[in-house]
Amino acid sequence: MTSKKERLDVLLVERGLAETREKAKRAIMAGIVYSNENRLDKPGEKIDRDLPLTVKGNPLRYVSRGGLKLEKALKEFPVSVKDKIMIDIGSSTGGFTDCALQNGAKQSYAVDVGYNQLAWKLRQDERVVVMERTNFRYATPADFTKGMPEFATIDVSFISLRLILPVLRTLLVPGSDCMALVKPQFEAGRESVGKKGIVRDPKVHADVLKRMISFSAAEGYICKGLSFSPITGGDGNIEFLLHLHWPGEGQEGQELPEEEIMRVVEEAHKTLKEKKADVPE
């Protein structure tokens, strides 16, 4: 049996402990990467995929930075994952799943169109149902053999939430909550996306959010809250956290006040700009 090993610098990026391979190498060479009490100083060293890793001065509680996004949502919004079956759409390394399990979730369906991305820690967790190579757009209730989801998280790229939310409503138990990550770069028109795929204009952010909230309400979701991700995406884009509630078929959806959307956009730009200024490259 072949041992499941990967380069140290690659693992740091996979787990969200470094944004790029180059930054991972710099951290390793600087002597701030540890596994338990052992310092690791060779970027190309092959190590077990499930080895615990920490970057000194940057302790991450989850298998990837994605966990920080859900952590903020659980703190800001009146919602709990305790004892719930969740579905993690676009699970990738599993940051959302890890955060949910640490907050008492009973089970997680980790759904991703990709393969071999989920952290080994989660692969080996009996509470996690790994659904790799799965295009959520074609998911049906029959795919969920261990109970229907009562809580959902969505963190997808290169696809609009408009293709995800209509499918999700056919799977959720009435009374479920959803934390959807709104990524303006995948929702705005091409003319609104700048160089390197980054959306910087607050007006575009507000417009994307207004349209997404209207769409969600038209699909029957109640929009209960809006915030912004505490970290930017890997490409530097500001992302937003949308709290949706699914009341069940035949119920009316509900939007958020426009002034609330504008307030969150303004706060996101101010906070993340200050945070960026405080962090040396």
Swiss-Prot record:
Organism whose genome encodes this protein: Bacillus subtilis (strain 168)
Disulfide bridge map: none
Descriptive protein name: Putative rRNA methyltransferase YqxC
Stated family: Belongs to the TlyA family.
SMART domains according to UniProt: S4
Classification of source organism: Bacteria, Bacillati, Bacillota, Bacilli, Bacillales
Domain named S4 RNA-binding: residues: 6-67
Keyword line: Methyltransferase, RNA-binding, rRNA processing, S-adenosyl-L-methionine, Transferase
SUPFAM superfamilies assigned to the protein according to its UniProt record, in alphabetical order: Alpha-L RNA-binding motif, S-adenosyl-L-methionine-dependent methyltransferases
Enzyme class: transferase
MF (Gene Ontology): methyltransferase activity; RNA binding
